[in-house]
């Protein structure tokens, strides 16, 4: 029960989901189709005014500049009307995006905490193993050496001289370092 996320009223609604830039552009184009239409009309009026200016037709050029102003006014009205019409939906979308960001931040934080807990557990396990090894080494140092049979000892030392006294890597490096000085 603790691992399950809290239920959200927006989970069941397919309208509220994360979207890519292209999906967002398409959605906005479908929501407010008059804005791109007004922009296209403005561009077309400017193009026609440019062509009229190149041709030297000042009357047509003035008409096209007026048409550009009307097209820009139409675009501005479409922006304002669309903003008023979709105001509540935009507020809901902003709230949803905030919730998504909070959820991602919480997941990131939880993953970080899990990683810290795992590292802490590994560190504790290592310390316990290290303490057990040290305790075993101290115990081995306190035990008396077993009695050796000379024949076996001579044969064993000839075959396996490293078993008699094993030194660690650090001790060997330290000995080499001291010999050089």
Swiss-Prot record:
Region (Disordered) residue spans: 136-160
One GO process term, biological-process aspect: mitochondrial respirasome assembly
Pfam families from the UniProt entry: HIG_1_N (PF04588)
UniProt key word Transmembrane: yes
Location in the cell: Mitochondrion membrane
Subunit structure: Associates with the respiratory chain complex III/complex IV supercomplex.
Functional summary from the UniProt entry: Cytochrome c oxidase subunit which plays a role in assembly of respiratory supercomplexes.
This protein's name: Respiratory supercomplex factor 1, mitochondrial
């Amino acid at each position: 029960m603790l691992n399950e996320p809290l239920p959200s009223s927006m989970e069941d609604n397919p309208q509220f989901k994360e979207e890519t830039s292209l999906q967002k552009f398409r959605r906005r184009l479908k929501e407010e189709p008059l804005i791109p239409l007004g922009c296209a009309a403005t561009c077309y009026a400017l193009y026609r005014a440019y062509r009229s200016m190149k041709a030297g037709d000042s009357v047509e050029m003035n008409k096209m500049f007026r048409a550009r102003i009307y097209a820009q006014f139409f675009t501005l009205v479409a922006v304002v009307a669309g903003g008023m019409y979709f105001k509540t939906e935009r507020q809901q979308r902003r709230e949803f995006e905030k919730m998504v960001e909070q959820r991602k931040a919480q997941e990131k934080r939880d993953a970080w905490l899990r990683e810290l807990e795992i590292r802490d557990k590994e560190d504790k396990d290592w310390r316990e193993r290290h303490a057990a090894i040290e305790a075993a080494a101290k115990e081995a140092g306190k035990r008396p050496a077993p009695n050796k049979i000379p024949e076996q000892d001579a044969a064993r030392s000839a075959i396996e001289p490293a078993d008699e006294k094993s030194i660690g890597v650090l001790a060997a490096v330290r000995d080499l370092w001291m010999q050089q000085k």
